[in-house]
Amino acid sequence: MCVVDDTGAVVLSRKLVNDEQPIRELVAEIDQLAEEVSWTVDLTTVYAALLLTALAAADTPVRYLSGRAVWQASAVYRGGEAKTDAKDARVIADQSRMRGADLPVLAPDDDLITELRMLTAHRTDLVADRTRTINRLRQQLVAVCPALERVAALTSDRGWVMLLSRYQRPKAIRNSGVSRLTKILGDAGVRNAASIADAAVTAAKTQTVRLPGEEVAAHLVAELAQGVIALDARITATDADIEGRFRRHPLAEVITSLPGIGFRLGAEFLAAVGDPARIGSADQLAAWAGLAPVPSDSGKRTGRLHTPQRYSRRLRPVMYMSALTAIRCDPQSRAYYQSKRDEGKQSIQATICPARRRTNVLYALIRDNRTWQPDSPPIAESAA
C-alpha cells in the first residue's frame, strides 16, 4: 500500500494485512492525510474482496488500474526491471494521481452477480477436471486393451464411462457377453446400451494376451471412471445452482430470449459484465468482448484496423459460442453467416460477424427491457 501527495511524493508506504480491522484503521488514517483521497487498486478478484467491501462501506469510490498497465508503466520508474509489492503500489498511486480521470470507477456487485461469478468459475474448474480425468483414463486404458481405448467414446458417450467403472479387462468383457453387458448398462440408464456392449465385446475379442501391470492398470481405470461419474454429478448439481440463481435475475428472460443463449451462457454473461446497466452502448459492449476492430494508424498510414488484444476473456467466448449456437438453430443467423461465407470469409471470421451483430441486439434488448421476437423491427448497425 502506498500513498502519494499531489506532487508525487510518497507520504505513506507499508504492508497491509488482509484483515478487516487493519483495513478500517488504515482507511481512517489515510482520510486524515488530506481532504480529498482517491483509492486505486489493481485487483478485483476475491483477494481484494475484503478491501473493496470495506471501502464501499465507507462510501469511498475506488478506481481500477489493470495489472498489465501497472507492469507497462513500471518500466519508466526508478528500479528498472525490479518488481516488488512496494514498487507496484507506488506505481499504482502515482498513475492514479496523474490519470485518475481516465480510470474506471469500480461499482460493487450485488450478491447474485457475485454468486454467479463464483459458480460459473467453479463449473469451469469441474469441466477442466473432467477433461483431465478422461485423458488419464484413456492413458490407463491403453495399458489394459488398446483396441478398447480406440472404440471407447469417453468424451461424448457417458455409457462407456459406466461400462469401464465395472469392466476393464478384455477377458472379463468377453466372459460377460453382449447380452449381459446390455442389461447392466440398460439398468444404469444408458440409452445405446446394445451398441456400446457390442463394440466393447468386439474390441475385447481382438486381444487375448495379458499386458504387464494389467491388474493395477485395470484398478486405476475403474477408479478414474468412477471419478468421471462423480464429476458429472457435481457438474449437474452446479448447473442446477447456476440456473436457479440466474432465473432470479430480472433480465434473465430478456437475455435468454435471444437465440443461442441459454441459462449457462446467460450466467456467464452476467458474471462477465456485472450489472448490465453499466453498459453504455452497443459499441462499448462489442469492444468489451473484443469484437470491435481497433485502429492502427501511424503518419500517412490511416484506415488500418487490427484485432484488439485487451478485452474480456470471459465475455468474448459467451458472444462467440452464442453465435455458433444460433447459426445452427436460428434461420436468420444462419442466413447472415452464410452470406459472410459467400463473401469469402473463413468459418471463424464469418462466425465473428454475427457475434458482433448480436452485441447490438443484446444491448438493445437490455436497454429496452424487452424480449427478442423474430418479427421485431431491425436494430440499426453500429459503427464499430
Which sequence ranges carry the predicted segments?
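A detector of single, family-specific signature residues
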Residues: 1-384
